[in-house]
Amino acid sequence: MPIFRFTALAMTLGLLSAPYNAMAATSNPAFDPKNLMQSEIYHFAQNNPLADFSSDKNSILTLSDKRSIMGNQSLLWKWKGGSSFTLHKKLIVPTDKEASKAWGRSSTPVFSFWLYNEKPIDGYLTIDFGEKLISTSEAQAGFKVKLDFTGWRAVGVSLNNDLENREMTLNATNTSSDGTQDSIGRSLGAKVDSIRFKAPSNVSQGEIYIDRIMFSVDDARYQWSDYQVKTRLSEPEIQFHNVKPQLPVTPENLAAIDLIRQRLINEFVGGEKETNLALEENISKLKSDFDALNIHTLANGGTQGRHLITDKQIIIYQPENLNSQDKQLFDNYVILGNYTTLMFNISRAYVLEKDPTQKAQLKQMYLLMTKHLLDQGFVKGSALVTTHHWGYSSRWWYISTLLMSDALKEANLQTQVYDSLLWYSREFKSSFDMKVSADSSDLDYFNTLSRQHLALLLLEPDDQKRINLVNTFSHYITGALTQVPPGGKDGLRPDGTAWRHEGNYPGYSFPAFKNASQLIYLLRDTPFSVGESGWNNLKKAMVSAWIYSNPEVGLPLAGRHPFNSPSLKSVAQGYYWLAMSAKSSPDKTLASIYLAISDKTQNESTAIFGETITPASLPQGFYAFNGGAFGIHRWQDKMVTLKAYNTNVWSSEIYNKDNRYGRYQSHGVAQIVSNGSQLSQGYQQEGWDWNRMQGATTIHLPLKDLDSPKPHTLMQRGERGFSGTSSLEGQYGMMAFDLIYPANLERFDPNFTAKKSVLAADNHLIFIGSNINSSDKNKNVETTLFQHAITPTLNTLWINGQKIENMPYQTTLQQGDWLIDSNGNGYLITQAEKVNVSRQHQVSAENKNRQPTEGNFSSAWIDHSTRPKDASYEYMVFLDATPEKMGEMAQKFRENNGLYQVLRKDKDVHIILDKLSNVTGYAFYQPASIEDKWIKKVNKPAIVMTHRQKDTLIVSAVTPDLNMTRQKAATPVTINVTINGKWQSADKNSEVKYQVSGDNTELTFTSYFGIPQEIKLSPLP
């Protein structure tokens, strides 16, 4: 390794007293395989910051405290055309496969840095990588950066996928995610020890500030092209669609636009408090928060202040692995979401402020924050490496811009801000284009930027263009809410579910409902009103949410945030907005739900809605939602969430720092909650045994084995499309769950299987399971009856008439025994060899950070032992249990089981006759011919239900298989059900076809998106 010359640099800086030792600079390589996840950073605030740099005679490197990104100094490079400086750093460029293995997600090694121009330069900065580079030697690979900009810009490229070939003969193809292809970067291998920065040759001289040069592992999806640098990844810019015919410029249309604008301003200044806004109204606090940013204007242009970064731009640093000095400087960054929230709070205060002096100060604060934001590189054409999940960071910038539009115009900043916001909105191009497509129903768009989109359009100064844009926006919102997106795309579904991340996801849909409702409300009663089809579809989704919430959604529907279930109370205002936007307002259904979840009375309704409306009663009966492979059974104030999963619906969402132990979230779960807080009912994370989800059949694993085998995302799907629920008469329901584990997933027993069925009717549910198998000889298989925290108000169990409050407590139950949990739910054991009941102290772990937790819990579970072979179980749950009632039910069971009868229970078919309701539920896990009073044959896997009432037979059927792929839309499935006897339809409105064939009747059900169909039959005379 040669000794690099630093003579010219040392003379310039007076910093170096000895020749540079090249070995010192390269002894700790970047991307060291022993510590691949620790980013290597040059930030010029460190000791001897230029030790690894050299320059030719036409370049001068100095340190400047004028502006910086990381720390208080940057590198100022004064150059003459074609001159260069070199960073001497050994790289061991990993393949994407090696990087991905180290991080546990699709990754790539990235080279990134920041640069600042005080004036645009008509030329390119050339970055070269090679071995023993000097100013005149040929490099092996590199890339170019266009310099025609002012302010800060960030450059970030994949060393495997974004470099251009120089003089080497290489197989210069992109590296696949598994690293099987060579790339320029990989062909360099461990040969790189020099990175050369070469000034444009076509410009006589200039100067550039450079800071925060970094080598790090980053997500392979997020090195985006922009106006400065070309990478393999591009985010196309927005092209506004214009609907035809366009509305003319008339006083009426302009007045409507102004009305919408004022409504929007009024909502954000004085309307409903935003759930995701840290509202601050204290002027002194706003000023102190502003002062903490340390923003000041520089004499010759630009600003200096704390560096701004989005919460997702943090990732490229791998902050958990930074050394202590780098971490300290990194921690001084300001998160853009907090910054733009302050901008909004200042803009809101500005609108409300009456004192001229105070108002002027707020205005100057806002304008300086805007200038700093732009100077930091948040401008049109600047990708800043990536700005994914932009809406969460920037949503309040858009709204503040509308509130401060006059001040921005006066300062000649509005056009630049408008262009910047439009540029960064391109992540939601499928929405901002306003042309309905498969990707146009993005719930995250509604959640974060839909109202901001409208605010941006209202800034358009040209009257005709502004009318066109708002009119197109209205048509787009109508279409986005109306369409059924194909495959797993975001949007509303025919059964009332609302999809995000390829599944029903209240954590995303609830705020999206609220914001979509507000948009419809803002546009109401104008030529720009949202169409009725969009309104109707949103109403269906929001009424469905009312059904599957109590008011929180159950743990099985909480996504990656268990014990933080979204509540309808957080989106109550959305029901008001949508009710008041009805064609004939208010819509009575939505208005009554609003009153109920807002705890408003009938007496208050007149002042709210202008007429007397009774608050909605809690839903009752059974509702199938196969868009989420779940069913909801409501009885009085209790809600039972029955949850399965299949090839179309994932079991749980597990992230790197979320829901690490959530594997069993959908394993035939049957969570019971009363109306109110789930925490108050014992659903507490501290001490929670993650193996024991209520109703689930699981292998009881130590936490280290239960922890997801994937370091990052796991959204496990089933091996079959069949698993889900059905309903009958809106009152009765059934779940069928076919549990089959994958064959090749670490820490998942490939031989773990179970068939689980539940029949729900009124105040009781019947649970049966069969074909329970496991090959794990060390871990017990269990079916959990319940698990609740013990608290002062949840401190009692009843077992066979005995009140239990002891702690600790252990006992074993068997067939015929009963117990009542601390929430008043009764459990009658009707077929099980061993049921364990426990009141004990439990030690567990937090789902996000794996830190220990502990708590006291009551639990009961059926113990299937280790390696069960075709094990089975049966039990009943009563939702209105008392010791007296459970004693009566146990007596009925002992008397020849007067409660229910299992007519069949094997790997192909489960049949349950509920004697209390006279409803029969059939889970056809396979097509089958059966011996039964009513059903003779079913030609496809299906859930069939029957109810005999006097002279009529009501039959429903469905397949929970949505018959779709992740890309292709769901299509209907025809189910043929042959029933015994000759019948005719007693329901003219039924869509079920029927035909008598010999002594039987053939029923043809069309199952679309798992929505059950039913028919009422009467005997042929």
From Swiss-Prot:
Enumerate the residues binding Na(+). H43, M70, Q73, D211
Catalytic machinery residues: H501, Y508
Instruction: Give residue numbers for the site Important for catalytic activity.
Output: E653
Q: Which GO terms label this protein's molecular function in UniProt?
A: carbohydrate binding; chondroitin-sulfate-ABC endolyase activity; metal ion binding
Reactions performed catalytically: Endolytic cleavage of (1->4)-beta-galactosaminic bonds between N-acetylgalactosamine and either D-glucuronic acid or L-iduronic acid to produce a mixture of Delta(4)-unsaturated oligosaccharides of different sizes that are ultimately degraded to Delta(4)-unsaturated tetra- and disaccharides
> The organism sits in which domain of life?
Bacteria
Which first-to-last residue range defines the signal peptide?
A: 1-24
Record's Pfam families?
A: Lyase_8, Lyase_8_C, Lyase_catalyt, Lyase_N
Q: Where is this site: Transition state stabilizer?
A: R560
Could you state one GO biological process linked to this protein? glycosaminoglycan catabolic process
Which CDD domains does the record match to this protein? GAG_Lyase
Where's it found, cell-wise?
Answer: Periplasm
- Annotated EC: 4.2.2.20
**How does pH shape activity?**
Optimum pH is 8. Is essentially inactive at pH 9.0.
Q: Please give the function described in this protein's UniProt entry.
A: Endolytic, broad-specificity glycosaminoglycan lyase, which degrades the polysaccharides chondroitin, chondroitin-4-sulfate, chondroitin-6-sulfate, dermatan sulfate and to a lesser extent hyaluronan, by beta-elimination of 1,4-hexosaminidic bond to unsaturated tetrasaccharides and disaccharides. Is not active against keratan sulfate, heparan sulfate, and heparin. Is able to promote functional recovery in the injured central nervous system (CNS), via its role in the disruption of the normal organization of the extracellular matrix (ECM).
The record's section on PANTHER family has:
CHONDROITIN SULFATE ABC EXOLYASE, PTHR37322
Question: Any domain commentary?
Answer: Consists of three domains. The middle domain contains the catalytic site in a wide-open cleft.
Its name, as the record gives it, is Chondroitin sulfate ABC endolyase
Provide the organism lineage as a comma list.
Bacteria, Pseudomonadati, Pseudomonadota, Gammaproteobacteria, Enterobacterales
